[in-house]
Amino acid sequence: MASDFAIEARGLSKSFGDLRAVSELELNVPKAEIYGFLGPNGSGKSTTIRMLCGLLTPTAGSATVLGTVVPGDEQSLKPKIGYMTQKFSLFGDLTVYENLKFIAEIYSVPTRDHKRRIEELLSNYDLVKQSKQFAATMSGGQKQRLALACAVLHRPQLLFLDEPTSAVDPQSRRDFWANLFRLAEAGTTIMVSTHYMDEAERCHRLAILDRGVKVADGTPQELQQATGMNVVEVSANDPYAAQSALAGLAEVVSVTQLGIRLRVLIPDHHGDPVDLAERALAGEGITATIRQTPASMEDVFVAVTMRAEACRK
């Protein structure tokens, strides 16, 4: 019976000497969705992707990727997946067209289909004017579009993207995500790692990794509703004094300054968070406007990673 999941991982772990990079990871990635990996550098995102691609052998555990067990028959998996590395890894001394043609030959795309498929990708990814340009001379956004075009040239069922927008401008990031949604709508499953909170919110589902451990997963809405935190926003004439007063409260988990506003996380078992903040600031003679607000993805990330840190102590 065919699975509804493109990826199923059970106890997937990887150690490098004494370093546990990924620990007993459990994953279920539905088909035709964008599944995000959110976490800081060193959290195990890239290591996990490389294990799922068959490029790294797990220390323990296994995964089923598009019906193929890894470790096991990685060779049969390669034609079904695309992989875009974090660092631009195409040939700088080849033109855009030559890079695409080279990838087509690697994946044994029939020669009669080369020209049509490459022209289609040049058009779809706005690279027609750059087709004869050497890849090394392109901007970050152009290189990103070329790398994505190469990754999808052979029409993979599953696409792995390792922090693909880490070196491009905001407009290029938005355009890139528009392309990802079109791919998902056409049936491609996408796993994308990121440390951008706004990108995490665009995913259909995501997992949050911290020190190689999955500390939360679900849809962005599910994660935001399950933080166990109340979030209040404080606008004060003296943000620094307000931050000092609130950060000193035992009930407060986190205080972050955003311009003249403060974003305050308070566990939901402490009662009315607005009243708590008002009393604390009034006691210091600080005048402020305080309102409760929904949790953002950054709030979710702070809450779950702090909870994980507390469990490790």
Model-found features: residue ranges?
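Conserved catalytic motifs of ABC-family nucleotide-binding domains
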Residues: 155
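Conserved ABC ATPase "signature" region
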Residues: 101, 105, 110-130
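Conserved ABC transporter NBD signature motif
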Residues: 61-72, 76-77
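Hydrophobic anchor residue at the start of the ABC signature
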Residues: 148
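Conserved ABC ATPase signature
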Residues: 93, 134-138
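Catalytic Walker B motif of ABC-type/P-loop ATPase nucleotide-binding domains
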Residues: 159-162
